[in-house]
Structure formats: C-alpha cells, structure tokens
C-alpha cells in the first residue's frame, strides 16, 4: 500500500463495512448519494437505487451521514466492540 492510501483506504473501508450513507461531491459540483459497495485504486462503486461506478479523480469530497471512527494501528476488533468506543 502506498503512503497516499494510508488514510483513504481505511476510511473508505470503514464506510463500506458499516454501510454508512455518504454524499459524494464531484469536481463539477454534482452530488451523489448512496452507500459504498466497493472500491479500488481508481473507482468507488456507489449503491443507491442503482449502482454507479465513480472515478476517484472526479471526486472532490466524501461526506458521511454520521461520524465514523477510524481504526488506529493499535486497535483490535475486540476494542471496536467495547461500549463507548463508537
């Protein structure tokens, strides 16, 4: 994993795993809404009533509908399950 993806991939993966609804703003101002179904180095698959493949180079901002907690390097799955860590 390259240094550029050290924050992006865990962030997108948390949004995907927790099925957090997101608003994605494109560089041309268009707002897309849905849940992140999948992603790779170049695209995000956004699911709403239909699935849309959105190229990352066209994305300006990803806004989750609620706050998300990113796992840090020392976190374990057990720590995420404890009350008060949400």
UniProtKB/Swiss-Prot annotation:
The keyword RNA-binding applies. SUPFAM superfamilies: Sm-like ribonucleoproteins. It comes from the Bacteria. The gene is hfq. RNA chaperone that binds small regulatory RNA (sRNAs) and mRNAs to facilitate mRNA translational regulation in response to envelope stress, environmental stress and changes in metabolite concentrations. Also binds with high specificity to tRNAs. Keywords: RNA-binding, Stress response. GO terms for molecular function: RNA binding. One of its GO terms (cellular component) is cytosol. GO terms for biological process: regulation of DNA-templated transcription; regulation of RNA stability; regulation of translation, ncRNA-mediated. This is RNA-binding protein Hfq. Residues 9-68 form the Sm domain. Homohexamer. Coiled coil: none annotated. Belongs to the Hfq family. Residues 66-86 are annotated as: Disordered. Transmembrane segments: none annotated. It comes from Ectopseudomonas mendocina (strain ymp) (Pseudomonas mendocina). InterPro entries: Hfq, LSM_dom_sf, Sm. The keyword RNA-binding applies.
């Amino acid at each position: 994993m390259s240094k550029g993806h050290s924050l992006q991939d865990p962030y997108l993966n948390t949004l995907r795993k927790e099925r957090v609804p997101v608003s994605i703003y494109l560089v041309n101002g268009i707002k897309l809404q849905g849940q992140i179904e999948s992603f790779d180095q170049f695209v995000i698959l956004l699911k709403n009533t239909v699935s849309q493949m959105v190229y990352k180079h066209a994305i300006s901002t990803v806004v989750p509908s609620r706050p998300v907690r990113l796992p840090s390097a020392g976190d374990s799955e057990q720590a995420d399950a404890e009350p008060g860590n949400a």
